[in-house]
A protein has these predicted regions:
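Alpha-helical recognition domains of nuclear gene-regulatory proteins
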Residues: 4-5, 29-33, 66, 92-96, ...
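Conserved C-lobe activation region of Hanks-type protein kinase-like domains
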Residues: 6-75
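Regulatory extensions flanking the kinase catalytic core
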Residues: 102-143
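Short, flexible/disordered secondary-structure transition segments
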Residues: 12-13, 40-45, 74, 78, ...
Length: 143
């Protein structure tokens, strides 16, 4: 849940408020998708975004402690930051789950960034799925 929802400070009469919380949620889903991508190293057993910080079915108070008090967000492994394409995804995630809803990217901005990533990938002559990051963090390209 987005911080403003946990704090009960969301403006329910403003459609933009809903869009901002959706962007936060989208970032959590993108984090989950990235964590399951074999292009960023070995795919480990599934773990929810806050899995290492909260129990399996956390209560609202536990999420408030993690998201509001501790400003916790899902962990971004260093191997993701060593992958050129995934690094851009990580930067996008961080900007989408900003504590301040007004500071978050819009959904349109996320679309534009991903389009840019796709365009960059075409220019480089390879697809993101060809680039693998082994556990040691070095980058290799599949032939």
């Amino acid at each position: 849940m987005a911080p403003e929802v946990l704090e009960s400070r969301m403006n329910l009469e403003n459609v933009e408020s809903f869009k901002q919380t959706d962007v936060y949620s989208m970032a959590l889903v993108l984090w989950e998708m990235t964590s399951r991508c074999n292009g960023v190293g070995e795919v480990k057993e599934y773990e929810p975004p806050f899995g290492s910080k909260v129990r399996e079915h956390p209560c609202v108070e536990s999420m408030k402690d993690n998201v509001l008090r501790d400003r916790g967000r899902p962990e971004i492994p260093s191997s993701w930051l060593n992958h050129q394409g995934i690094q851009m995804v990580c930067e996008t995630l961080i900007e989408c789950w900003d504590h301040d809803p007004e500071a978050r990217l819009t959904a349109q901005c996320v679309v534009e960034r991903f389009s840019e990533l796709k365009h960059h990938d075409k220019l480089s002559g390879r697809s993101c799925s060809e680039e693998k990051i082994p556990e040691d963090g070095s980058v290799t390209t599949a032939k």
